From Swiss-Prot:
InterPro entries: PPIase_dom_sf (IPR046357), PPIase_FKBP_dom (IPR001179), Trig_fac (IPR005215), Trigger_fac_C (IPR008880), Trigger_fac_C_sf (IPR037041), Trigger_fac_ribosome-bd_bac (IPR008881), Trigger_fac_ribosome-bd_sf (IPR036611), Trigger_fact/SurA_dom_sf (IPR027304). This is Trigger factor. Residues 161-246 form the PPIase FKBP-type domain. It comes from Aliivibrio fischeri (strain MJ11) (Vibrio fischeri). The keyword DNA-binding does not apply. Belongs to the FKBP-type PPIase family. Tig subfamily. Keywords: Cell cycle, Cell division, Chaperone, Cytoplasm, Isomerase, Rotamase.
Length: 432
């Protein structure tokens, strides 16, 4: 076998491989003999059919099959010999393939980039300094009360924090448009659900009031036919309701299954907030470390890996919305390409950190991660046992631990300082 390696643009490589004719003919002859021995032919006893007849009937098909198998096998031998690490499946192209002649074929593929980490000492990370304060707990309790609130008719004007039930009809240049009409539409004021200017027109109005407002649809509005258009809405206020909050008492506490009355609920809420805060701090530090790593290391990315990641993201998107990945229409690549490339880059760079630092998943860290995750469940012991009894889940947690260790290795060389945050300030920066 002869092999030549050609370096194309970027990460693309082309191997040209020559396989001696004798190898091909031996493989073709062996397969034809196998067919003659094991298949039945009309007019002949099994295994007694003339080889010329078998070759005439099956020769070309066998030769094509042999070519495919030979190209795959010799490609693998070639990349092992040349110490090449392909990043995806090759594209084979026969250059010369005729009976009695050497097989010459090319294999085009991409390789993984050679990553030489740099600039870790220029990565800037601000560690959040934050705690759960009494006022944060009080605000969370108020949120829980709002979640359990009811609405009651009131002789009041619509304002932020009230709920207005309205009928409306929208028109553009005097013509009603699709989706611009509703009856008994509940609108919680101050939530920003409607286009700019819509709620402003309703503020100060009471049940029975009728009005017409002029608004403009935003240029980025989701409906193409409405983007940037001026519209009029005829609105009738059916009713205005005030929010009624439940008392913070034992009856309210019972809805959440907390023990120890109001103080017990406060303690449980604080505990949950502190757990979420610890994760948010970890996420914020990790985000900065990885962003810095990516900014300091510009690498080529194999398109084959991006393609694979796009497909993963597509499937996740379909599943997230309750669809079937096999039957759902294929979502546009553009929706996922940027995120897919980012994930591939991060994976390659973190992989190089792990390799260069010779990191192995720390068993104690794996155990701590499982315990931390399990603490959010009603029976943590049961969750821990489930993980420890499932090798796939354990491997997932080992990968998480290894990634955290890689981030710690980056932080050890980075410029790390501290920055004060409020609870809500930090939590609002977390991805949805």
């Amino acid at each position: 076998m002869q092999v030549t390696v050609e370096t194309k643009e970027g990460l693309e490589r082309v191997l040209t491989i020559t396989v001696p004719a004798a190898n091909i003919e031996d493989a073709v002859s062996a397969e034809l003999r196998n067919i003659a021995k094991n298949r039945r032919f009309d007019g002949f006893r099994k295994g007694k059919v003339p080889m010329k007849m078998v070759a005439k009937m099956y020769g070309q098909a066998v030769r094509n099959d042999v070519m495919g198998e030979v190209m795959q096998r010799h490609f693998i031998e070639a990349i092992v010999k040349e110490k090449i690490n392909p990043a995806g499946a090759p594209t084979f192209t026969p250059v010369e393939f005729a009976e009695g002649k050497d097989l010459v074929f090319s294999a085009s593929f991409e390789v993984y980039p050679e990553v030489a980490l740099q600039g870790l000492d220029k990565v800037v990370v601000e560690k959040p300094q934050v705690e759960v304060k009494d006022e944060d707990v009080a605000e969370m309790l108020e949120t829980l009360r709002k979640q359990q609130s009811t609405w009651a008719d009131a002789d009041i004007a619509a304002e932020d924090g009230t709920r207005a039930t309205i009928n409306f009809v929208g028109s553009i240049d005097g013509e009603e448009f699709e989706g611009g009409k509703a009856e008994n539409f509940p609108l919680e004021m101050g939530q920003g659900r409607m286009i700019p200017g819509f709620e402003d027109g309703i503020k100060g109005k009471k049940a029975g009031d009728e009005l017409t407002i002029d608004v403009n649809f935003p240029e980025e509005y989701h409906a193409e036919n409405l983007k940037g258009k001026a519209a009029q809405f005829a609105i009738k206020v059916v009713k205005v309701e005030a929010r009624e909050l439940p008392e913070l008492n034992d009856e309210f506490v019972a809805k959440f299954g907390a023990e120890g009355g109001v103080e017990g609920l406060k303690a449980e809420v604080r505990k949950n907030m502190e757990r979420e805060l610890a994760q948010a701090v970890k996420n914020k530090i990790k985000e900065q470390a990885i962003n810095g790593l990516v900014e300091q290391n510009n690498i080529d990315v194999p398109s084959a890996l991006i393609d694979q990641e796009v497909q993963v993201l597509r499937q996740q998107a379909v599943q997230r919305f309750g669809g079937n990945a096999d039957t759902a229409p294929e979502l546009p690549r553009e929706l996922f390409e940027e995120q897919a490339k980012r994930r591939v880059v991060v994976g390659l760079l973190l992989g190089e950190v792990i390799k260069s630092e010779e990191l192995k998943a720390d068993d104690e860290k794996v155990k701590a991660l499982i315990n931390e995750m399990a603490s959010a469940y009603e029976d943590p012991t049961e969750v821990v046992a489930y993980y420890e009894g499932n090798e796939q889940m354990m491997n997932n947690m080992r990968n998480v631990a290894l990634e955290e260790q890689a981030v710690e290795a980056i932080l050890a060389k980075a410029q790390v300082s501290e920055k004060a945050f409020g609870f809500n300030e930090l939590m609002n920066q977390q991805p949805a």
